[in-house]
Amino acid sequence: MLVAASARDAWSDTHWVRSSVDAFLADQARSAGATLLESTQLLSARFDPLEHRWTCTLKTDCAKTACASTEDSEASIEATWIVDATGHQGLQTPSIDNPDDSSFMHTRTGAVFGHFEGVAPFVAASSPEDPFCGDDAAQHHLLDEGWVWMLRFDHGVTSVGLVQPSSTQRSEGMFWEVLERHPSLAELMQHAKLVAPLGQDSAKPTMGSVDRMSRCRARASGPGWVCLPVSYGFVDPLHSSGIAHSLSGVVRLAEALLSDRNDCYESIRTYGADLRREIQWLDLLVAGCYAAQPSFENFIAYACMYFVSAIEFEKQLAVDPGRWPKGFMQCHDSRWVPVVNQAYEFLVRSDQTHVRNEPTLSQFPIQVRRWIEPWNRVGLLDPASANRISHSVAPKYASSIEGLCRSLAK
């Protein structure tokens, strides 16, 4: 299946190397006047509710930075707000009590991953009818249980990761064993060489591993602090929603923090409630795909729930880039949300007894095509399209973050 996320290569925004993104954001922050402290640890943070002010003690590892001294340095700073952008680690301070609250999540997956040189192109799957080169896209190689991602960057490195249920054991050896059991993947990786990430105690590359990626915190905010979406919760890389979700949080929090204190807290309370609903929604969009496995046809059918959500959401952004739509990825859409719930329940009911009702499940793509018809303007599940969609969303330039920021600055 091929679905174009961008109308043209010039507007595409996929396959960002994380280190490049981080460097870009750091440069933008500096240009905007922010002070950037790298290799710095938060030792303590104390909040004064009367003054609405934090007093924070920081420690910088001068051996890793351009400090004048070779000894670690400590500094004290004050701030009215702390924005938690730490990701899964969370801020470690007694003043912020925010335990894990992931029990509600349907998606429970882990991953083992690395950056490789020498990954071969996936020529075997190409077709003259392809709307674009599949190697230029985020590839999802579906297994009976789980999947393998391949993201080819333009400097010869490919990010490869194996995603499976969190109950599955993870190791570099297991990664290669799974690939060897799938000849098409084994052929792609036959001459691949691991180049990153580097091990903590050596310069030798060692594959990274996360036992459970799916997570959520109890709260998105508290007195004087607030989380970006990536720190509050994350579901799974299946639909590549993480960066977009976090950027949506940047836009919303910027607007809230620039308002007066009363309006700010009200906006942040709303933001927190929205984040919980958004994580639940993304969880639903992902979990249904896993519930559909090992059927490729049913997986594609349920994946259309994500595609419709993305198309409708980006359509709203394109109409008015200066107005943030209510509900990330249509999670507040009163017409669309029941359709996705219905599709998910259909799959779950058919598998509740652990004896899959194959005749019923075989009808799932037909049902989905009927359910999505009012929104389906691009030919999803249309036999004539042969699962190849050349155009699905509005031009990215119309919904750029730059356009949103210009509107916020007015």
What is each residue range found by the language model?
Residues 1-41:
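Conserved N-terminal/central alpha/beta ligand/cofactor-binding core
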Residues 10, 14, 18, 101, ...:
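Alpha-helix N-cap/helix-initiation motif
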Residues 14, 18, 47, 54, ...:
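Tryptophan-centric aromatic hotspots in well-structured domains and transmembrane helices
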Residues 20, 24, 111, 245-252:
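Short amphipathic alpha-helical face segments that pack within enzyme cores
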Residues 23, 85-86, 231, 237:
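Generic detector of well-ordered alpha-helical packing
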Residues 28-192, 250:
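Predominantly flavin-linked oxidoreductase catalytic cores and closely associated redox partners
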Residues 148, 168-286:
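FAD/FMN-dependent oxidoreductases across multiple families
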Residues 255-410:
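C-terminal helical "tail/cap" subdomain of flavin- and related membrane-associated enzymes
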